[in-house]
């Protein structure tokens, strides 16, 4: 098996879907390793726009088989709704090319209710979750009381475990705006439909062990990783290279490329430290020109300059072999472009490649910037590297040097599927 892994290098929303879509055209198998329907990205294919959340974007390729892996959490109503939406838009046969690991966990409506209650209790220190129930679902998984997808098929086991979860949360929160009987009734119907999609993951993957092109689609990003991100303002899964390997039982020697997706500036949704965030006209311009609204939540994304401290840290953990720089065209109309190159910590220490583990400390760092000249010309839809303005190429090559020579092999120049430069 030859495996390529696509990972977000910042706080998500980097544009991973487009490179995944492009690579999926040659892939036999495309896998999601972690996360749930809290993830979200958009792919423009022909004259149609597809929004993906829990489903792998390899579904756009008619020859690619897709797997939702063991590290994910699956909201079953969203799975069927998203699948129906894709088929209505013309992705015929998508339902025949998607499978779910029996070891993935079930994200319930109960979890969404609890998510809202937990956020409310945090008050001013809330995490800023998507409200989709992802955190409570992973919490139940870690506490060994969660429900796996394979257990949906055993009605008695599913009912016993769901009633136990309901009772436990009622003991903690009191009365809930949740009806366990309604959810049990819904799953009585889903049980009839789910059987063909559920697979023993290891046996399933063994069928593809000789495939030269397997693609792993990361969700969220390194700075939202449960261990390495800006804890506690993170998601509840392992979003980096290690998480992908664990969730899909990957042989390390089979990995042929790890692709880090880097937005040409930085965005973040939700609460938490964001050192290079811009509370000024530059931030507003990045937000409006980049149309920075979350696919899943619709929330306005926070915007700032490219932060190379974050990128170096991400590179050190995920070991990228190549980079995809996205949304270069959003910077077309800036006279000058700033890049964060170092942090000055509250004690005066300067760091270029590490992120303080303490979120309170990270909130207080000062960013050291370099200023690069803008290019003030249109890069939208450019297909060849040599056709980019000189200063745009200088910006890309500066990033390569600062990230230890990892090549920027792909450059996004617009929202369309083919608005991408592929460098040799």
Swiss-Prot record:
Which keywords does this Swiss-Prot/TrEMBL entry list? Cytoplasm, GTP-binding, Ligase, Magnesium, Metal-binding, Nucleotide-binding, Purine biosynthesis
> Mind telling me which GO cellular component terms the entry cites?
cytoplasm
Q: Which Pfam families match?
A: Adenylsucc_synt
Q: What is a biological process (GO) this protein takes part in?
A: 'de novo' AMP biosynthetic process
Q: Where in the cell is it found?
A: Cytoplasm
- Positions contributing to GTP binding: 12-18, 40-42, 301, 327-329, 412-414
An example of a GO molecular function for this protein is:
AMP binding
Please list the disulfide bridges: none
Keyword presence, DNA-binding: no
UniProt lists the family membership as follows:
Belongs to the adenylosuccinate synthetase family.
Protein's name according to its UniProt entry: Adenylosuccinate synthetase
């Amino acid at each position: 098996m030859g495996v390529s892994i696509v990972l977000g290098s910042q706080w998500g929303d980097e544009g991973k879907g487009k490179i995944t879509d492009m690579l999926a055209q040659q892939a036999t198998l495309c896998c999601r390793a972690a996360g749930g329907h809290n993830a979200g990205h958009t792919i423009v294919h022909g004259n149609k726009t597809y929004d993906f959340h829990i489903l792998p974007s390899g579904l756009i390729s008619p020859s690619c088989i897709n797997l939702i892996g063991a590290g994910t959490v699956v909201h079953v109503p969203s799975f069927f709704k998203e699948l129906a939406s894709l088929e209505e838009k013309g992705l015929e046969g998508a339902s025949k090319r998607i499978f779910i690991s029996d070891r993935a966990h079930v994200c319930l409506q109960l979890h969404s209710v609890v998510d809202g209650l937990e956020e409310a209790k945090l008050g001013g220190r809330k995490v800023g979750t998507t409200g989709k129930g992802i955190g409570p679902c992973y919490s139940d998984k870690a506490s060994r009381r969660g429900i796996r997808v394979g257990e949906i098929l055993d009605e008695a086991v599913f009912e016993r475990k769901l009633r136990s979860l309901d009772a436990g949360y009622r003991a903690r929160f009191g009365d809930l705006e949740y009806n366990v009987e309604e959810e049990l009734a819904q799953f009585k119907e889903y049980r009839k439909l789910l059987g063909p999609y559920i697979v023993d993951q290891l046996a399933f993957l063994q069928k593809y062990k000789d495939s030269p092109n397997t693609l792993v689609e990361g969700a969220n990003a390194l700075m939202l990783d449960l261990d390495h991100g800006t804890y506690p303002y993170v998601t509840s899964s392992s979003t980096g290279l290690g998480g992908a390997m664990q969730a899909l039982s990957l042989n390390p020697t089979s990995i042929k490329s790890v692709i880090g997706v880097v937005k040409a500036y930085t965005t973040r949704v939700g609460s938490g430290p964001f050192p290079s965030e811009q509370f000024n006209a530059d931030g507003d311009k990045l937000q409006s020109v980049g149309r920075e609204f979350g696919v899943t939540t619709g929330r306005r994304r926070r915007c700032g300059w490219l932060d190379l401290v974050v990128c170096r840290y991400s590179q050190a953990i995920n070991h990228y072999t190549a980079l995809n720089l996205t949304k270069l065209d959003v910077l077309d109309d800036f006279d000058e472009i700033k890049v964060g190159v170092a942090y000055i910590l509250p004690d005066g220490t300067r760091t270029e490649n590490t992120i303080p583990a303490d979120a309170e400390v990270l909130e207080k760092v000062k960013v050291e910037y370099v200023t690069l000249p803008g290019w003030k010309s249109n890069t939208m839809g450019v297909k060849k590297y040599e056709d980019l303005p000189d200063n745009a190429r200088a910006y890309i090559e500066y990033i390569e040097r600062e990230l230890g020579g990892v090549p920027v092999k792909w450059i996004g120049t617009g929202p369309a599927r083919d608005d991408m430069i592929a460098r040799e």
